[in-house]
C-alpha cells in the first residue's frame, strides 16, 4: 500500500523545501498553484525547482585500506555540459582527455571470473594510462563500478600517477549525502554501506564525482541525460591545438541488464556513431550481445535456430515473457545492423591478448575516418603499436586507393600550419626577379586522382612527422621514417623554425640561452630565428666554431626568403646586396661558388643537405635526449654529431650551474653529455676494430657541416679525455708527433743529437708519404709531387715492415735536402729545439740578474731581451693566425689557455722591467727588482715542458687543481688567523698609536705559528725570567717602582692554545686530506690526462715555425713574404689557408661517400651488438623468464580448474551410476512383487527411458551459459543418505494450469549448488473439476508448477518423510487443497459403492527427497508424451488412482481419528499402510480427510473448478489419464492421501499429457519411467507407523526410477 505521506519524488512531504519567491519564476508559481488546485501526474520538470549548488569540495574517503581524496560537485540534471567541462578543466585542473572511456554494466553486484577480472582491470588501466584517457562510470560501489574501482585501487597503490576516473551518479541514491552539503569544503566520507539501506556509497577509487540531482530520492535515471550530453560535448573538443581530431569516445559494456542493450543502441545510432567494446564472459547483457555478434550476419540477420535459442536465453536471463523477449531481441538485432562498430573482447582469443587493444582498435576500425586521421589519433595516444598494426598495414608501400581521403578540416589545418611557406614563395619570386629577371613557368596542376591522393598521403605523413617531433614521440618518428617519410624533403627552414619555437614537449632553457646571447630581454612571444640559433651554437661550442646559420650565404638566403626589409636586414647584419669583386678576393673560393649556385626560387633551397644534423642539434638544444639519440643513429657523420652533442650538453650544463636554475637540470645535462661522449667513444672503438686506417681518416677528415673542423678538434673542445686517449687517436698523434721520422727507441736522444750535430740527421730513418696515418694539406701537395718524382719508391711504400733492401731503397729515395727539411719540421724536433733554446735563455737570464747590473745592458742581457721580444711576436702571430674570424674572438680564444696567460704576464712584466732598467737610478734598481720577480714566471713556464713526459705531466695537472683547492682553504684560514691575531694584538698592546704596522702585526706572528714557529719566549710575558716583573705599587730589589701589569695578559696563552689547535691540527690536516683526494682523483685518470695534454702540446708545436726565438724572427719574415706572394697560388689550391694547416684530411666526394657508408655500418653493428648484449644480460633473461613463468602459471591454473571440474563431474557420474544400479534393483524387486504389472511392460518402460535420456542430455548441453549445470539432490532411503546430481527437469514459469503448488525453502550454500527443501508436506491431489468431466475413454490430470517469480526456474519438490521435527515454517507460501471426489468424478456406469468398497493398504518405507533443478537449464518448450524429457528424473514413491476398464475410482472415508489436534492439523509426513493383495481380490480405498481439510477444500473448490474449466476449454478432449489393471472382481483402486498435502507436478508435463492422446499402455510406461509407482494396493493414510510396518520389505511399493 502506498504511503500517503510520501511524495512521488521519494521523500516525505514534510521534507520538501518551500520555494523561494525570489528564485522562483512566475511560470513555476502558476504551475505550483495548479498543482495545489487540481492533482496531476508528477514530473521532474514541473514539480522540482533548481537552486544554486550547495555541495562541492573535496571528499576524504575513510574505511578503506588507505585514504583517498576526490573532488565532487552536486549539479542539476539539466546543467549545460560546457559549464561542466569548464569546471573540470579550469577549477579541477584536468587536462582534456585524448580518449573517453564510458563504462556501462550491471548496477547489481555480480561476480566476475578472477582471471577475466584481472585482464579487464589491467587492460582498462593500461588504456587509460597510455592514452591519457578519462573513465566515466556510475560512481557508486555496486555492480561493474566496483570492479572498475578495484582495478583503479590496484593501480593507484602500485604507481604514483592516478587515472582520471569520473563518477557520474544520481544525488538521490548516494548514501550519507547529507555529509556532502557545504560549499568548497573538505568532507570525511565513510565508505562502509548500511546493509538495510537501499542507497549506495560512492566508490573510493574515483578521482572526481559529478552528482546529478533531479529532486528524487532513491531513484536512478537523473544522471543518464547529463552523462550522455557531457560525453557528446567532450567528444567535440580537439585533442590539442596541433591535431584537428576530436576526443574519441568509446563505450565499454560489462555484464548489465536490458537497459545496457538500449544504451548500446543509442551509442551506435549517434551521429557520428560511437564504437562499443563488449566484454564477453562477464554475464547477462554482454554475453547475449557477444553471442549475437558472433553468430549474426551482416545486416542483423541471424539463423532461425539460433534466433530461438537467443530468445530462450533472453527469457531465462531477464525473466521476460515472450513479448518482452521479442522486443529486446529486436533491439539487439538493431544493434547488430552496425556490427562493424561493435568489438567483442574474448579472453584468450587469438589476436586479442588485452582489452586495451580491443578498445583502441575499436576506435580506429569503428569510426570511419581516413588513414591520416587514424594516424593523428594513434599519435595523440602515443600508441605506436596501434599505428603499426592498424594503419601501416601495408608497410612502406602505398595504401590502396580510397583509404586515404583526408577530410576537409585536415586540409585546412595543413594550410594553417604552413604560413611561412606562402611568404617563402613570395619572397623567392621577388628575390629571383631582382637577380635574374626570369619568371619560372607554372607547374601544371595534377589531375590524376590517384596521384592527388598519394600527395595528400605524403602531406599527411609529413604533418604527422612534424607533430611527432613536436610531441617528442620517438617511436612514431622511427615508424614514419620506416614507412616512407623523406626527411630531406620534409625538413625545410620554416618547419625547423617551427620546431625551435614550439612550446610543447619537455621544458627547455633555449629562451634563456637566446636571451644571454642577444644580451637583451626578449618578449614572451619572441620568434626564435635560425640566425639566433646559430649565435647560440657558436656561444655554446666556444673556440673558433662557426655555425652554418651565421655564415653569410645562409643569412643572404634567409633574408631573401623571409626578410620583407631585405636590404636593411642585410645592412644590419653587416652585409651588402652586391659585394664588389675586389672585396671578394678575401673570401674563399668555395664560399663564392656556393653563393653563385644559390637559386632563390628553387624549392630545394629552403631544405637541408643533412636534415638529421639539424634535427639532432634541435633535439639537444630542446633537451630531448631520447629523440637526440635516435636522430644521432640516422644520417651521416655520426661520430662528429656525438661529439657536438657532448660539447653542447656540457656547455648547457655549465650555463645552468652558473645561473639560478635548479641543480637537477645541470646534473641531467651533464649525464646526457656523458651518454653522447660514450657513444662517440664506442663508435670510434668499433671503427678501429674494423679498419685502423679508415678509423684514423674518420678522426681527421674535414667536417664541412661542422665549421670545417675535425672529430679530434671537436673531442678536444668537448674535453673528452677518453676519446683522445683512445688507441686510434694516440696512434694518429704519435705519427704526427714524429713527423717523417721513423724512430722506435730513444727518440729524444736521437733528436738532440741531430740538433747539436746536424750531420747525424742523414743517419736517421724516415718514412715515405704512404706510411702516414694522416694527411695535412701541405703534405698532400708534397706527396703528390713526390709521387710524380719517385714513382718507383712509392710503389714499395706500403707497410712499415719489410726487408733491409726495401728499407735502403726507401732511404735512398729521399733526397738529403728533403731529409733535413722534414727533420726540422717534425713536431718532436721543434719541441726539443725550443726546449734547448728556452733553457739557454733561462741560464742567461739567471746570469743577468745574479751579477752586477751596469748602466747599459750587456750582450747577455740583449740576447735575453731579443728572446722575449721575438717570443712576444710569435704570440701575436698565434693570435692572428688562429681560426676565429674576429680579432676580439681570436684574443678571447687565445686567453682560454692558462699557459698563454702566464706568458702574457711574464712578457708584460719583463717589458716594464726593461723600460725601467734603461732609466737612471733609482728607476734602474726598480727595473732590476722586476727582473728578479719576473724570472719566477719563466721558471713556472718550465712546467709546461714537463707535460710531454708520461709521469711528470699528470703531476703538473695535480698542482693546478691543488692550487684551486688551496684558495678555498686560504679563505677559511684567514678567518681563524684574523680572529686570533686581532685579539692578541689588542690585549698585549693596549696603548698603540694608529699606523700601518698594526696590520702587519696582526698577521705576522699568527701566520708563522701555522708552520710551527710559536715564539715561545713571548707566550707569557711575565712567566719568564727574562721579562721584568710588574705590579701595582711594587718595587724591585733596587727600589725602583715596577711598571703596572697589562690587564688580561694571562688570556693570551689560552687564546694561543685554541688557535694552534684549530689552525695547526684541524685546518692543516683538512688541507692535506683535500690534496690527497685531488691526488687520487687525478691519479686514477693520469693516463688520460697525460694523453690529453700531449695532444695540446703536439698541436702547439705542429703549427709553430721551425726556428726558436730569438731566431724565430727569420721565420716570421719568411711567412710574411710567402703570404704576400702566394695569394694566386692559394686560389689555385682552393680554400686552404694557413689556419687550415692542422691535422686535417681533405677527401673527394667519392671518398667521403665511402667513409660515410663505413661509419653508418659501424653504427648499425654497434647497436646490434648492444641489443644482443642486452638480450643476453641477466636482467633481461630474468625478465623474460618471469613473463614465461607467469604465463605458464596462468595456464596451469586453467588446467587445474578444468581438472577439478572434470573430477567433480566424474564423481557425480559414479554416484549416479551407483544409485541407478541400486534403485534399478529395488524397482525390479518391487515391481515383481506388485501384482498387475506385466514383465513385458516393465522392459518396455525401461528401454524407453534409456532412449529418451540421450535426447535430454543433448538438449541440456545446448543450453546457454550452463557452466555449472548440476545440482545436488538428497535422498533418505531407509536411513541411508545418497548424494548425486540431477539435471532432470526444466520447467517454464507461468505456463501451466494454475493450481496450488508446493512451497519451498531455499537453502543458500556457499558453493554454486542450490538445494531446495520442501517446507511442508505435500498432498497428492487429483484435479477432477466439473469442467473436465470424465469420459468413458480417459481421465484428466492437471498439475501446476511453482507460482513465485523468484522460484520460476525451479522444478517442484516432492518430499515424503517420516521425521516428526519437520514443520511448516512459511505459512504465506503454504497452500494446500483437500482433494475431493464429486459425483462427476465417478465414471459413468460405475456405482459409487464400488469405490467405497475398494480398499487397499500399502506399506512403504519413508522417503525424504529434495529436488532442485539447475537455474540455467530452464527452457520454455512444449513437450509431448512421446518426447518427454526424462533425464534421470527423481520422484518420490508415487501412487496413482487405478481403474479397471478405464474407469476412475475413488473413495472417501471421513471416520479417521487423530490422536491429537496437532496431529490433525500439522502432520508433516505421509504415513501409508500397505496390505498385500492378490489379483483375485478387490478392496475399497478408504479416503481419510480431516475436518479442517474438508473445510479448506470446500472454500477453494469453486475457484479451482473455474481454473480447470478455463484450461479445459483450450485443450481438446483426450482420454483420461489412468493406470489400469484388471482384476477378477472388476473392482477399482484409489490412492487417497492427507488433505493438507499437495503434490505439484511441472506444468510442462501437464501440457504434454493433455496435448496428444496416447493409449493407456504407453502412458503407463512413461509414468513408470518417471518414477511413478503403479500399485494395485489400497492405500490407507494412518497417523503413525509401527515397527512391524517398517520391517516389511518385499511388499513395499516405493520405487524411484533413474535413467
UniProtKB/Swiss-Prot annotation:
GO terms for biological process: calcium ion import across plasma membrane; calcium ion transmembrane transport; cellular response to light stimulus; G protein-coupled glutamate receptor signaling pathway; metal ion transport; monoatomic cation transmembrane transport; protein tetramerization; visual perception. Inhibited by extracellular zinc ions. Inhibited by intracellular Mg(2+). Activated by the neuroactive steroid pregnenolone sulfate. Negatively regulated by activation of GRM6 receptors in the ON-bipolar cells. The keyword Transport applies. It catalyses: Ca(2+)(in) = Ca(2+)(out); Mg(2+)(in) = Mg(2+)(out); Mn(2+)(in) = Mn(2+)(out); Ni(2+)(in) = Ni(2+)(out). Residues 852-897, 950-961, 1076-1105 are extracellular. The chain crosses the membrane at residues 831-851, 898-918, 929-949, 962-982, 1055-1075, 1106-1126. GO terms for cellular component: axon; endoplasmic reticulum; endoplasmic reticulum membrane; plasma membrane. Residues 1-830, 919-928, 983-1054, 1127-1603 are cytoplasmic. Residues 1182-1240 form a coiled coil. InterPro entries: Ion_trans_dom, TRPM, TRPM_SLOG, TRPM_tetra, TRPM_tetra_sf. Pfam families: Ion_trans (PF00520), LSDAT_euk (PF18139), TRPM2 (PF25508), TRPM_tetra (PF16519). Belongs to the transient receptor (TC 1.A.4) family. LTrpC subfamily. TRPM1 sub-subfamily. Constitutively open nonselective divalent cation-conducting channels which mediate the influx of Ca(2+), Mg(2+), Mn(2+), Ba(2+), and Ni(2+) into the cytoplasm, leading to membrane depolarization. Impermeable to zinc ions. In addition, forms heteromultimeric ion channels with TRPM3 which are permeable for calcium and zinc ions. Plays an essential role for the depolarizing photoresponse of retinal ON bipolar cells. This is Transient receptor potential cation channel subfamily M member 1. It comes from Homo sapiens.
Amino acid at each position: 500500500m502506498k504511503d500517503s505521506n510520501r511524495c512521488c519524488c521519494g521523500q516525505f512531504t514534510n521534507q520538501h523545501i518551500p520555494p523561494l519567491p525570489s528564485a522562483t519564476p512566475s511560470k513555476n508559481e502558476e504551475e505550483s498553484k495548479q498543482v495545489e488546485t487540481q492533482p496531476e501526474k508528477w514530473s521532474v520538470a514541473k514539480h522540482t525547482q533548481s537552486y544554486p549548488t550547495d555541495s562541492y569540495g573535496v571528499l576524504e574517503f575513510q574505511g578503506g585500506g588507505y585514504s583517498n581524496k576526490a573532488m565532487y560537485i552536486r549539479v542539476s540534471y539539466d546543467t549545460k555540459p560546457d559549464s561542466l567541462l569548464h569546471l573540470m578543466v579550469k577549477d579541477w585542473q584536468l587536462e582534456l582527455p585524448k580518449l573517453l572511456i564510458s563504462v556501462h554494466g550491471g548496477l547489481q553486484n555480480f561476480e566476475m571470473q578472477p582471471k577475466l577480472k584481472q585482464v579487464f582491470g589491467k587492460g582498462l588501466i593500461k588504456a587509460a594510462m597510455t592514452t591519457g584517457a578519462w573513465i566515466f562510470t556510475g560512481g557508486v560501489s555496486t555492480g561493474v563500478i566496483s570492479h572498475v574501482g578495484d582495478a583503479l585501487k590496484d593501480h593507484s597503490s602500485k604507481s604514483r600517477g592516478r587515472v582520471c576516473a569520473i563518477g557520474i551518479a544520481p544525488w538521490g541514491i548516494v548514501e550519507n549525502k547529507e555529509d556532502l552539503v557545504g560549499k568548497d569544503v573538505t568532507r570525511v566520507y565513510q565508505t562502509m554501506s548500511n546493509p538495510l539501506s537501499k542507497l549506495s556509497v560512492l566508490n573510493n577509487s574515483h578521482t572526481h564525482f559529478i552528482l546529478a540531482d533531479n529532486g528524487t530520492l532513491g531513484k536512478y535515471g537523473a544522471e543518464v541525460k547529463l552523462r550522455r550530453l557531457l560525453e557528446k560535448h567532450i567528444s567535440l573538443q580537439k585533442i590539442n591545438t596541433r591535431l584537428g581530431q576530436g576526443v574519441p569516445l568509446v563505450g565499454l559494456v560489462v555484464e548489465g541488464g536490458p537497459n545496457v542493450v538500449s544504451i548500446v543502441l543509442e551509442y551506435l545510432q549517434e551521429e557520428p556513431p560511437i564504437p562499443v567494446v563488449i566484454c564477453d564472459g562477464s554475464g547477462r547483457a554482454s554475453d547475449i550481445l557477444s553471442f549475437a555478434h558472433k553468430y549474426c550476419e551482416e545486416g542483423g540477420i541471424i539463423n532461425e535456430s539460433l534466433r530461438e535459442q537467443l530468445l530462450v536465453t533472453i527469457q531465462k536471463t531477464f525473466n521476460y515473457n515472450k513479448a518482452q523477449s521479442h522486443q529486446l531481441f529486436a533491439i539487439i538485432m538493431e544493434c547488430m545492423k552496425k556490427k562493424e562498430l561493435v568489438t567483442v573482447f574474448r579472453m584468450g582469443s587469438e589476436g586479442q591478448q588485452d582489452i586495451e587493444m580491443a578498445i583502441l582498435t575499436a576506435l580506429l576500425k569503428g569510426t570511419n575516418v581516413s588513414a591520416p586521421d587514424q594516424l593523428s589519433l594513434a599519435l595523440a595516444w602515443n600508441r605506436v603499436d596501434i599505428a603499426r598494426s592498424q594503419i601501416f598495414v601495408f608497410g612502406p608501400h602505398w595504401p590502396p586507393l580510397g583509404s586515404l581521403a583526408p577530410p576537409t578540416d585536415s586540409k585546412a589545418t595543413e594550410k594553417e600550419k604552413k604560413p611561412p611557406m606562402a611568404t617563402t614563395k613570395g619572397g623567392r619570386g621577388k628575390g629571383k626577379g631582382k637577380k635574374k629577371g626570369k619568371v619560372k613557368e607554372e607547374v601544371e596542376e595534377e589531375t590524376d586522382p590517384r596521384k592527388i591522393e598519394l600527395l595528400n598521403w605524403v602531406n599527411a605523413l609529413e604533418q604527422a612527422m612534424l607533430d611527432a617531433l613536436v610531441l617528442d614521440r620517438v617511436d612514431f618518428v622511427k615508424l614514419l621514417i620506416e614507412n616512407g617519410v623523406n626527411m630531406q624533403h620534409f625538413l625545410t627552414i620554416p618547419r625547423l623554425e617551427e620546431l625551435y619555437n614550439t612550446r610543447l614537449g619537455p621544458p627547455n632553457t633555449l629562451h634563456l640561452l637566446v636571451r644571454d646571447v642577444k644580451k637583451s630581454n626578449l618578449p614572451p612571444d619572441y620568434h626564435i630565428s635560425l640566425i639566433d640559433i646559430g649565435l647560440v651554437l657558436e656561444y655554446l661550442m666556444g673556440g673558433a666554431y662557426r655555425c652554418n646559420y651565421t655564415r653569410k650565404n645562409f643569412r643572404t638566403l634567409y633574408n631573401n626568403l623571409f626578410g620583407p626589409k631585405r636590404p636593411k636586414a642585410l645592412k644590419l647584419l653587416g652585409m651588402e646586396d652586391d659585394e664588389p669583386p675586389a672585396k671578394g678576393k678575401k673570401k674563399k673560393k668555395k664560399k663564392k661558388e656556393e653563393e653563385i649556385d644559390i637559386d632563390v626560387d628553387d624549392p630545394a633551397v629552403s631544405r637541408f643537405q643533412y636534415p638529421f644534423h639539424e634535427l639532432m642539434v634541435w633535439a639537444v638544444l630542446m633537451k630531448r635526449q631520447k629523440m637526440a639519440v635516435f636522430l644521432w643513429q640516422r644520417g651521416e657523420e655520426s661520430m662528429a654529431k656525438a661529439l657536438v652533442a657532448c660539447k653542447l650538453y656540457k656547455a648547457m650544463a655549465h650555463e645552468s650551474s652558473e645561473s639560478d636554475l635548479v641543480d637537477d637540470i645541470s646534473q641531467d645535462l651533464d649525464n646526457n653529455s656523458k651518454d653522447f661522449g660514450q657513444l662517440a667513444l664506442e663508435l670510434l672503438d668499433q671503427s678501429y676494430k674494423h679498419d685502423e686506417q679508415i678509423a684514423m681518416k674518420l678522426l681527421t677528415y674535414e667536417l664541412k657541416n661542422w665549421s670545417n673542423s675535425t672529430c679530434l678538434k671537436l673531442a678536444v673542445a668537448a674535453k673528452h679525455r677518453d676519446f683522445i686517449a683512445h688507441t686510434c687517436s694516440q696512434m694518429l698523434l704519435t705519427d704526427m708527433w714524429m713527423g717523417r721520422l721513423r724512430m722506435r727507441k730513444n727518440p729524444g736522444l736521437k733528436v738532440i743529437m741531430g740538433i747539436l750535430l746536424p750531420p747525424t740527421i742523414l743517419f736517421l730513418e724516415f718514412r715515405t708519404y704512404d706510411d702516414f696515418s694522416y694527411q695535412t694539406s701541405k703534405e698532400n701537395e708534397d706527396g703528390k709531387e713526390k709521387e710524380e718524382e719517385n714513382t718507383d719508391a712509392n710503389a714499395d711504400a706500403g707497410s712499415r715492415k719489410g726487408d733491409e733492401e726495401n728499407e735502403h731503397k726507401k732511404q735512398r729515395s729521399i733526397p738529403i735536402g728533403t731529409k733535413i727539411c722534414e727533420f726540422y719540421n717534425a713536431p718532436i724536433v721543434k719541441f726539443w729545439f725550443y726546449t734547448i733554446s728556452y733553457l739557454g735563455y733561462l741560464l742567461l737570464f739567471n746570469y743577468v740578474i745574479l751579477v752586477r747590473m751596469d748602466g747599459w745592458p750587456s750582450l747577455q742581457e740583449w740576447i735575453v731581451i731579443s728572446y722575449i721580444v721575438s717570443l712576444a711576436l710569435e704570440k701575436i702571430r698565434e693570435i692572428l693566425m688562429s681560426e676565429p674570424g674576429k680579432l676580439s674572438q681570436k684574443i678571447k680564444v687565445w686567453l682560454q689557455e692558462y699557459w698563454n696567460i702566464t706568458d702574457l704576464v711574464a712578457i708584460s712584466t719583463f717589458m716594464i722591467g726593461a723600460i725601467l732598467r734603461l732609466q737612471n737610478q733609482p728607476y734602474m734598481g726598480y727595473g732590476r727588482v722586476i727582473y728578479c720577480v719576473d724570472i719566477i714566471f719563466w721558471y713556472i713556464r718550465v712546467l709546461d715542458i714537463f707535460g710531454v713526459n708520461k709521469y711528470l705531466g699528470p703531476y703538473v695537472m695535480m698542482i693546478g687543481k691543488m692550487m684551486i683547492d688551496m684558495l678555498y682553504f686560504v679563505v677559511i684560514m684567514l678567518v681563524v688567523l684574523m680572529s686570533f691575531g686581532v685579539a692578541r694584538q689588542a690585549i698585549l698592546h693596549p696603548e698603540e698609536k694608529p699606523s700601518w704596522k698594526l696590520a702587519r702585526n696582526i698577521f705576522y706572528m699568527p701566520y708563522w705559528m701555522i708552520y710551527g714557529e710559536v715564539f715561545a719566549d713571548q707566550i707569557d710575558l711575565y712567566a719568564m725570567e727574562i721579562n721584568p716583573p710588574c705590579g701595582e705599587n711594587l718595587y724591585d730589589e733596587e727600589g725602583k717602582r715596577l711598571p703596572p701589569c697589562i690587564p688580561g695578559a694571562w688570556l693570551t696563552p689560552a687564546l694561543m692554545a685554541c688557535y694552534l689547535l684549530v689552525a695547526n691540527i684541524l685546518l692543516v690536516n683538512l688541507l692535506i686530506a683535500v690534496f690527497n683526494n685531488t691526488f687520487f682523483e687525478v691519479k686514477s685518470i693520469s693516463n688520460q690526462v697525460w694523453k690529453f695534454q700531449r695532444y695540446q702540446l703536439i698541436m702547439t708545436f705542429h703549427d709553430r715555425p721551425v726556428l726558436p726565438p730569438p731566431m724565430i724572427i727569420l721565420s716570421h719574415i719568411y711567412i710574411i713574404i710567402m703570404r704576400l706572394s702566394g695569394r694566386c697560388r692559394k686560389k689555385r689550391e682552393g680554400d686552404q689557408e694557413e689556419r687550415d694547416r692542422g691535422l686535417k684530411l681533405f677527401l673527394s666526394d667519392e671518398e667521403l661517400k665511402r667513409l660515410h657508408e663505413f661509419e653508418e655500418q659501424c653504427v648499425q653493428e654497434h647497436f646490434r651488438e648492444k641489443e644482443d648484449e642486452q638480450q643476453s644480460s641477466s636482467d633481461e633473461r630474468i625478465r623474460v623468464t618471469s613473463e614465461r613463468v607467469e604465463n605458464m602459471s596462468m595456464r596451469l591454473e586453467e588446467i587445474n580448474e578444468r581438472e577439478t571440474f572434470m573430477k567433480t563431474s566424474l564423481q557425480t557420474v559414479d554416484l549416479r551410476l551407483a544409485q541407478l544400479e541400486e534403485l534399478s534393483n529395488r524397482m525390479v524387486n518391487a515391481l515383481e512383487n506388485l501384482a498387475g504389472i506385466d514383465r513385458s511392460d516393465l522392459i518396455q518402460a525401461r528401454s524407453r527411458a534409456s532412449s529418451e535420456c540421450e535426447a535430454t542430455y543433448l538438449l541440456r548441453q545446448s543450453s546457454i551459459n550452463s557452466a555449472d549445470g548440476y545440482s545436488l539432490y538428497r535422498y533418505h532411503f531407509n536411513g541411508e543418505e545418497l548424494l548425486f546430481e540431477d539435471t532432470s527437469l526444466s520447467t517454464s514459469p507461468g505456463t501451466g494450469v494454475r493450481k496450488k503448488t508446493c512451497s519451498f525453502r531455499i537453502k543458500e550454500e556457499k558453493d554454486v549448488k542450490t538445494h531446495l527443501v520442501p517446507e511442508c508436506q505435500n498432498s497428492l491431489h487429483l484435479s477432477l473439476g466439473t469442467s473436465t468431466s470424465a469420459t468413458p475413454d480417459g481421465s484428466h490430470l492437471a498439475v501446476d508448477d511453482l507460482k513465485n517469480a523468484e522460484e520460476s526456474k525451479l522444478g517442484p519438490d516432492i518430499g515424503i518423510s517420516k521425521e516428526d521435527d519437520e514443520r511448516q515454517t512459511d505459512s504465506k507460501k503454504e497452500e494446500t487443497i483437500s482433494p475431493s471426489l464429486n459425483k462427476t468424478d465417478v465414471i459413468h456406469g460405475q456405482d459409487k459403492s464400488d469405490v467405497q468398497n475398494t480398499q487397499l493398504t500399502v506399506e512403504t518405507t519413508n522417503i525424504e527427497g529434495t529436488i532442485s533443478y539447475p537455474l540455467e537449464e530452464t527452457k520454455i518448450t512444449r513437450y509431448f508424451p512421446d518426447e518427454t524429457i526424462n533425464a534421470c528424473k527423481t520422484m518420490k514413491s508415487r501412487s496413482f488412482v487405478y481403474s479397471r476398464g478405464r474407469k476412475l475410482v475413488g473413495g472417501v472415508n471421513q471416520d479417521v481419528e487423530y490422536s491429537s489436534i496437532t496431529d490433525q492439523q500439522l502432520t508433516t509426513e505421509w504415513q501409508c499402510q500397505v496390505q498385500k493383495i492378490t489379483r483375485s481380490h478387490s478392496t475399497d480405498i478408504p479416503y481419510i480427510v480431516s475436518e479442517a481439510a474438508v473445510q479448506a477444500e470446500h472454500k477453494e473448490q469453486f475457484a479451482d473448478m473455474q481454473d480447470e474449466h478455463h484450461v479445459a476449454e483450450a485443450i481438446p478432449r483426450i482420454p483420461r489419464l489412468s493406470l489400469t489393471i484388471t482384476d477378477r472382481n472388476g473392482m477399482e483402486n484409489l490412492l487417497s492421501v492427507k488433505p493438507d498435502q499437495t503434490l505439484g507436478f511441472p506444468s510442462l508435463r501437464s501440457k504434454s499429457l493433455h496435448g496428444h492422446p496416447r493409449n493407456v499402455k504407453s502412458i503407463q510406461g512413461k509414468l513408470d519411467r518417471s518414477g511413478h509407482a503403479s500399485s494395485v494396493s489400497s492405500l490407507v493414510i494412518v497417523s503413525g507407523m509401527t515397527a512391524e510396518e517398517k520391517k516389511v520389505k518385499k511388499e513395499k511399493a516405493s520405487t524411484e526410477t533413474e535413467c
